[in-house]
Amino acid sequence: MDRLAQDYSLEITYKSYYLRPDIPPEGIVRPLKDGEKVGDSLTGHIGEVAAEAGLTMRRAPLTPNTRMAFEASEFAKVKGLFEQFHRACYRALWEDGVDLGQLSVLLHLGEQVGLDAQEMKNILDTGHYESQAKEQYDEALSMGVTGIPSFIIGGYFFSGAQSYETFKKVVEMVKNPLQLL
């Protein structure tokens, strides 16, 4: 997404989507496929697209409850540190297999990117951004989002891990609608 934004001078707006609201606060153990181990690189389409984008995605041991992470992300947005916090959360989950449902993890990641841990803790303890995260989730549902990642570019909705070339085609289509004829 960074490359696309730079190549086309796009503004990207990230929104929270609570993929699995049924996950308990302690998370759930991720089932492994035959021969798979925690920490293995993801394979298939997701692994290929991640590798193409220069991202590492490893099999995490746990599917975390991400409610607090979404609220922490809203806090990071207000402080102008969303992208840094988002990247730190991505690395923690997909590279290091860390549980993003743990307050201590989120506070540590926040501190790493320059957020005040005590202020973040107070925000998370009070549920200050809970309604905003819920509104974003409801908005996504109303748009037909059922999974992540999902994208809306110029009114076109698509979901799933996509290559840079796919994004590029969509942006070109939106920029030059007459090419569709």
Explain the meaning of each model-derived region.
Residues M68-A72:
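Conserved N-terminal beta-strand and adjoining loop/helix that marks the start
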Residues T56:
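Conserved active-site segments centered on acidic
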Residues P64-R67, G97:
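Aromatic- and histidine-enriched alpha-helix N-cap/loop-to-helix transition segments
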Residues M1-L10, Y14, D34-G35, E74-L181:
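C-terminal cap of thioredoxin/glutaredoxin-like
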Residues K33, A60-P64, E74:
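Dinucleotide-binding Rossmann-like beta1-alpha1 core, especially the glycine-rich loop
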Residues S16-G27:
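Short, charge-patterned binding micro-sites
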Residues R30-E52:
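Short, structured active-site "lid" loops
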